[in-house]
Amino acid sequence: MTANADFYEATYAVPMHCTDCTDDIKKCLNGITGIKDLQFDISQQMMSVNSCVAPSVIINALRDCGRDAIIRGAGKPNSSAVAILETFEDVDLKKDTAVRGLARIVQVSDQKTLFDVTVNGVPFSGKYQAKIHSNGNISEGVKSTGDVYYKFEEPIECSDASDLDKSLYSGQNFVSAPLPIWDLIGRSFVIFREGEPAYDIAGVIARSAGVWENDKQVCACTGKTVWEERKDALKNNIK
């Protein structure tokens, strides 16, 4: 378990209709170390989690129990961000997606920010490294993102089979950096494989909602419900 300073609140949309549902959700999450408190709003189908646990761990645990979940906000206002990580190789978008990972980011103290990094669909197994580059210009892939601004020490072990294709690989890690959120917005988040063959994916770090800042059920832009948008996201490998 991490230090108390690493605890943060996150809200999730989870289908629920009664106390039997919330009891089942509690049972699903019971075995996860690091959860301090769970709160439920059945009328809004929202769950609040105070923990030091990666959001991907919460979501995957619920999916293993047959329940879907969408993270709706994390941390205090202006303390969260996200980066959708894409490959810059040629991809037939009619059959595939360029998305190969996701970084969910939340600041937990003045000089500590947590990064929940998921990689899914890389062609080579092994250790991948994460780093932040100085700018968010991904027009030419990683080579146009500028100098390395911060490099994480902990690798991401990508040795699990990807659910995109059995010949591809996936991995996850929960890492931290002594950087505030405001200093990350607009920069690029890069995952790369050292050695040969080399491989990298990247995305621009963008601000996301803090806890209880996003409780909409229908998107004003598309008219789709959050669950319809969730299906679209899953099709595009955003999990």
Curated annotation (Swiss-Prot):
Transmembrane segments: none annotated. GO terms for molecular function: copper ion binding; superoxide dismutase copper chaperone activity. Residues 7-70 form the HMA domain. InterPro entries: HMA_dom, HMA_dom_sf, SOD-like_Cu/Zn_dom_sf, SOD_Cu/Zn_/chaperone. GO terms for cellular component: cytosol; mitochondrial inner membrane; nucleus; protein folding chaperone complex; superoxide dismutase complex. The keyword Hydrolase does not apply. It holds the Pfam family HMA. Belongs to the CCS1 family. This is Superoxide dismutase 1 copper chaperone. It comes from Candida glabrata (strain ATCC 2001 / BCRC 20586 / JCM 3761 / NBRC 0622 / NRRL Y-65 / CBS 138) (Yeast). The lineage of its organism: Eukaryota, Fungi, Dikarya, Ascomycota, Saccharomycotina.
